[in-house]
Amino acid sequence: MQYSTLAGQTDNSLVSNNFGFLRLPLNFMPYESHADWVITGVPYDMAVSGRSGARFGPEAIRRASVNLAWEHRRFPWTFDVRERLNIIDCGDLVFSFGDSRDFVEKMEAHAGKLLSSGKRCLSLGGDHFITLPLLRAHARYFGKLALIHFDAHTDTYDNGSEYDHGTMFYTAPKEGLIDPSRSVQIGIRTEHSKKLPFTVLTAPQVNEDSVEETVRKIKETVGNMPVYLTFDIDCLDPSFAPGTGTPVCGGLSSDRALKILRGLTDLDIVGMDVVEVAPSYDQSDITALAGATIALEMLYLQGAKKD
């Protein structure tokens, strides 16, 4: 049977399922596939505190990824990731728009079903709140996780709200999903609490240190734990990523962020996401292109393990 939505569910979304990442054909039955990594769009932005519009992020990232699809051996890598990994795009998560509780249930269930069938998840947001249900699914499967978190904000705020894109990494340690003492936050340049023992590498620090020193600190922190990797696009300076809900000046360049990512090849990264691309604030699609490039680099990290 041919489906046009994930698992053939009724989907009334107006922003979903145009075409796949890197021009991949959409595969709406990912659980039965032979995929190594499954890309899922997550058009959810009901937890934002600033400008909305990240629900259009998956579509924008996929559209920008067309600019990357032609390069079989992506520079500076020496292989084509599509020859090393079986990657599929299963389209967008189906949930009741306007119902955050339903979203959380559907996100956890989808990721859990993929993991239990031997797949790994790369999720395209969507606002950063999507990471919390993803962490729940991954911790249930892999146990307590280390977190590598690129962002302008620590997202460790405690404002009492159940659904907020600034509270996930306050909630996740409380639920035992991540070990903050083995987790690192990169690119931070906003006020934040120091109550939780995260290793915080501020944007000025990362911009002044060598890439090698930053990578060393990340690896020293997470060690050999299973790692969840999350990249909020506002980690980048607004000159490189204006199309996001809460931009903050003084961030990382795209070049520096990519070089840091490339240094993480030997870590046990078990789940990944790219979040907070909001294309209505973008200029010439540079934020969407940054998001697509980061997502592709994440996949190359996984392909490099096949050496």
Curated annotation (Swiss-Prot):
SUPFAM superfamilies: Arginase/deacetylase. It catalyses: agmatine + H2O = urea + putrescine. InterPro entries: Agmatinase (IPR023694), Agmatinase-rel (IPR005925), Ureohydrolase (IPR006035), Ureohydrolase_dom_sf (IPR023696), Ureohydrolase_Mn_BS (IPR020855). Pathway: Amine and polyamine biosynthesis; putrescine biosynthesis via agmatine pathway; putrescine from agmatine: step 1/1. GO terms for biological process: putrescine biosynthetic process from arginine, via agmatine; spermidine biosynthetic process. Its EC number is 3.5.3.11. One of its GO terms (molecular function) is agmatinase activity. Keywords: Hydrolase, Manganese, Metal-binding, Polyamine biosynthesis, Putrescine biosynthesis, Spermidine biosynthesis. It holds the Pfam family Arginase. Its cofactor is Mn(2+). Mn(2+) binds at H128, D151, H153, D155, D232, D234. PANTHER family: ARGINASE/AGMATINASE, GUANIDINO ACID HYDROLASE, MITOCHONDRIAL. Catalyzes the formation of putrescine from agmatine. Belongs to the arginase family. Agmatinase subfamily. This is Agmatinase. It comes from Neisseria meningitidis serogroup C / serotype 2a (strain ATCC 700532 / DSM 15464 / FAM18). The lineage of its organism: Bacteria, Pseudomonadati, Pseudomonadota, Betaproteobacteria, Neisseriales. The gene is speB.
